[in-house]
Every structure is written in structure tokens, then in C-alpha cells.
Amino acid sequence: MENVITERLEALRTELRREHLSAFVLSAEGSCWISGNDKAEGIAVVTQEDVELWKKKEYPTLTAAIPAIAEWLQEQFEKKKFQSPEIGIDGMQTSTADVEALKEQMKHRGGITIRTNFDPIERVGKNNPNPLITPIKLISPTEQTTQKLARIRQELRKQHADGMLATRREDVAWTLNLQTPDETGGKAAESYLLIASNKATLFVDSRRASNEVRAYLATQGVEVKEQKEISKGLKDYFEYNILVDPDEVCYTLYKKITRIVVFGESPITTMRGVSS
């Protein structure tokens, strides 16, 4: 296992040199891949010389670790260990709030800039076995999706929003009466629910959506599209504005939005908590 970790680190560092990045803040998925463990032990930052780990016990989330990460990166910068004043973080795996917080921290720590449009793990991990594609399963609802969507839209109006993007797995599953997906499913398990005033669209890996699931969602007024079409879906979103929960929606998708953004807490999370 030690040899595997060494090989993976070298492959990652090769990609960082190619992209002129001095460091990379790994997502939970990336940390798992580097360590070879199924579950991340913490948040890892990789440079050309070091690997620093902020253990999950002390820093349960990236949000909690950002000040410590920023301080450590500044120390590396001051020791002239960085050839480039730019570091990377995967914008598809990091919330808008966390990216903005890290950018703000680094701006005042030597002017280090953040790049979010690059995922080195996706490049160097191509020879890994594909993650298990678990099919979506329906659950017996106590409330139909049409009713939930009506209540969600009512709450959105209270926040002066015409629609919203839901990306939290539990929220998407609850709204659509689907079984909550396994956290170990990686990017293949991600799904996005785009809600407008008169339509809703689920963007999901098509291999996971059976005909039964598609048929049920169609009766509930929910269209199913391929996961990778989410960027186009946000571009084509026709409402005046859209609600974005910065603690939920990833930075990359937030930057794809062309309409006015209303920042606020997702009403789905609150509704789900009340119903459970």
C-alpha cells in the first residue's frame, strides 16, 4: 500500500507541475484515493514536497479547517517552497461558501490565488476501477413529489426566489421520494435537482435511473436528463432569479448560473428536518 500511495502522490505532483500549481486541496474523494482508504481520514493538502493532513476528529468539515489550511499555505509560501502563487481546489466538489472563504483567506496571505476548474484526481485516477453504479430506488411516499414541489415553491416565494438548485443528496432524494444514495458512490452518485416555477429537472447518471423511476418522476412533473447536462440546464434556466444555498451548491455550478442569484438557506433541508 505504501508503494501505491507514493506512486499516486508522484502522479498527482506531475499534474500539478504541468498546470503550474504549487498545492492542491483535496476533496474527501481525492483524500480517499491518495490514501487508498474507503473513508477519508481528514482533509489533505499536497505540495511538491509535503502532504499535510487536517484530521477529521479536529476538523470535521473543510469549513472548519480553512483558517488552519490558509495559515499553513502561507508558511509554505514564506519559506519559498512555492514556485507559483497559485493553488488548486476542485470546484465541483467544494461548496461556494468554502471556495469564497479560502479565496478571502489567501488574498490576505501573500496574494495566493485559487484555481477551481481542474481536478487532477480525474486525470491520474483513470486506471482505477470505476465506482459502483448503484441504481436509484423508489420509496413508498407519505407525500407525493408534486405536493412537496408545491410546498418548496411556496417557501421560495417567501424568499423572493423563482426557483432553486438542490445538490445535497439527502434533499434531492427526499423531494423525489428516492432512496438516499450511498455516500461512497463518488461523482457517479451525484445528482442535481433544478426547480423552476413550473417545471423541475433531475440531472443524474442515466445508468442509475430505471424506467420505473423515470415513469414515476414523469407523473410528478419531473424531467430526467443526463448528469453532465447540468451546465446547459443552468444556462437555459429561464426564470428571473434563482436561490442558491452557498453551503450546499458547489462553486463550479454557481459560476455557471446566468440569472440573478438569491443567496439563502435551502427550504428543502428545513422541510426534510420537520418531516423526519
Regions found by a protein language model. Give the residues of each.
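Terminal domain-start leader segments
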Residues: 1-276
